[in-house]
């Protein structure tokens, strides 16, 4: 019983473990039920999950800012970035630097726009980023008309599909991104500010923290990573098409929350985002093996997202209630005064 209690306490601090356990269990089930799973097939799953991890890390920073903030423009950013890469790189390695700069500038512009809408104008993040996504969708249609053909830079193609000693290069990029994000969250001032703002904006403001720049930085990080992800994803599939980023909208949110990042903000885990991305790709792979049609697959993924969000919401409310009780216990006089005021006849 003591060991179980100790593991429970440890798991609360390392919430990524549940996604990791889910990956292990689902992989074992698939290996037993089918004879088609091996280390090579796992490598393919990890490759697909790497693209989701990159955009999921950016989504994680936005969710960490609290108040239910999510970035719904990532799907449109991914798609538009793939088209911009084709238009700027034109299949030549000599133009690769121009394509990378264009992707970064696109991410910075979209992130700045989202920040202006959310921080400057006070529009809820869901509405603001959804509106931005519609604007980007129009720009994507215009880019599609201007696209002369599909030609991918060989160097970019190698980066997106190549392997080093059997390990996908994209997986290495994803691990580097997860490691860097973990260091930012745990070892830097920005990570501490981000957690403080996500936990309690009023308290952070009283502590002298400028909430606006911190929240704006999170949206910019999300857009830049989504744009770079679109650049690599376009090279991976060998072109670009409308709605190519759409699957990453719900999946990026699910990967963040399923990985252990609190939906109400204040605490994030980049490692959990990585494991949850692998788990979600395994779920999709399982549905494809079963033979579910695409529509049914979307329904199952939607149910998974709803279940995870509902569970995360209940856990957050439970933590908040426990914190309120703890605060009341620490300040019995204040609690009595509040109760007296509420009981006073009007």
Segment roles from a protein language model:
Residues 1-26, 179, 206, 210-213, ...:
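Cytosolic-side transmembrane-helix boundaries in multi-pass membrane proteins
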Residues 1-56, 92-98, 344-346:
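Membrane-interfacial amphipathic/re-entrant helices at transmembrane-helix boundaries
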Residues 94-103, 109-114, 165-241, 252:
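Helix-loop-helix "hairpin" substructures at the membrane interface of multi-pass membrane proteins
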Residues 226, 236-302:
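Transmembrane alpha-helical segments in multi-pass inner-membrane proteins
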Residues 49-60, 76-80, 108-112, 175-176, ...:
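Hydrophobic alpha-helical segments embedded in the membrane of multi-pass proteins
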Residues 28-30, 34, 39-91, 121, ...:
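Single transmembrane alpha-helix segments in multi-pass membrane proteins
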Residues 5-10, 65-69, 108-151, 184-189, ...:
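Short loop segments and helix-boundary regions at transmembrane helix junctions
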Residues 121, 125-187, 214-217, 236-245, ...:
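Transmembrane helix-bundle core of multi-pass membrane transporters
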């Amino acid at each position: 019983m003591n060991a179980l209690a100790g593991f429970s306490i440890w798991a609360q601090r390392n919430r990524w473990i549940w996604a990791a356990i889910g990956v292990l269990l689902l992989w074992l089930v698939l290996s037993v039920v089918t004879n088609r799973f091996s280390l090579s097939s796992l490598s393919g799953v990890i490759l697909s999950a790497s693209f989701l991890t990159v955009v999921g890390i950016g989504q994680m920073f936005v969710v960490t800012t609290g108040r239910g903030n999510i970035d719904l423009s990532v799907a449109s950013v991914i798609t538009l970035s793939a088209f911009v890469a084709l238009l700027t790189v034109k299949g030549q390695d000599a133009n690769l630097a121009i394509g990378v700069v264009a992707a970064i500038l696109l991410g910075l512009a979209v992130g700045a726009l989202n920040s202006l809408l959310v921080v400057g104008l006070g529009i809820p993040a869901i509405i603001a980023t959804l509106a931005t996504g519609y604007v980007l969708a129009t720009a994507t249609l215009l880019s599609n008309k201007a696209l002369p053909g599909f030609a991918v830079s060989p160097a970019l193609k190698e980066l997106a599909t190549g392997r080093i000693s059997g390990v996908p290069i994209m997986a290495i990029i994803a691990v580097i991104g997860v490691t860097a994000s973990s260091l930012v969250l745990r070892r830097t001032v920005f990570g501490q500010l981000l957690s403080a703002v996500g936990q309690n904006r009023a308290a952070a403001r009283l502590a002298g923290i400028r909430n606006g720049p911190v929240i704006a930085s999170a949206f910019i990080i999300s857009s830049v990573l989504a744009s770079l992800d679109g650049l690599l994803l376009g090279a991976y599939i060998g072109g670009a098409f409308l709605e190519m980023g759409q699957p990453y909208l719900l999946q990026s949110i699910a990967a963040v929350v399923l990985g252990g990042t609190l939906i109400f903000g204040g605490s994030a885990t980049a490692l959990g985002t990585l494991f949850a991305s692998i788990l979600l790709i395994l779920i999709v792979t399982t549905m494809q093996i079963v033979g579910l049609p695409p529509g049914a697959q979307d329904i199952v993924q939607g149910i998974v997202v709803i279940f995870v969000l509902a569970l995360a919401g209940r856990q957050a409310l439970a933590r908040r209630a426990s914190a309120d009780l703890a605060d009341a216990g620490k300040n019995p006089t204040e609690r009595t005064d509040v109760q007296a005021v509420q009981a006073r006849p009007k």
